[in-house]
Amino acid sequence: MPTMGDPRFVRSVIYVCAHNADGALGLIINNKMNSPSFLEILEQLEIPASHNTKNEIKDVYFGGPVETARGFILHSLEYNAGDTLVVDNEIGMTASLGIIKELAAGTGPNNSLFALGYAGWGAGQLDNEMQKNAWLSVDPDLDLIFNEVVDLKWDKALEKVGVNAALLSTESGHA
């Protein structure tokens, strides 16, 4: 949003996975990383990749600046391991080696987004930023999360709330 001063979050679309009195946690879903690739991560973890996995390009996203060496998988809920955080009735988040192994074997969830790191807020911080118009809130959308072209996610998220990105301004209160 125009009032977001932190360059790590400029034009970011973040799916908030948890938000309570203690704080909030979310994953940036529109910042694809050039490196490492999913196959490189599998090699580092010494996890064999199936033939299908090697031929399928699995993107890796910068999920946020916290715990950037840790993988977080946002996914559809037909997959629900014991350690899955159920976010809503369609989406879960799992951060285990087990789901990475299943993705490598081609047996993981139907829809998934692999992110390194997460965006985190302390108690009341996200609410405060929302009140200052640093963020806009959009209803969850499976297509936006899993199927939309990465470079179009920000514009598509704004369209969902009736905002034209071209009309946004970083200036306010000047006559």
What are these regions (language model features)?
Residues 1-115, 119-175:
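A short aromatic-anchored loop/beta-hairpin motif
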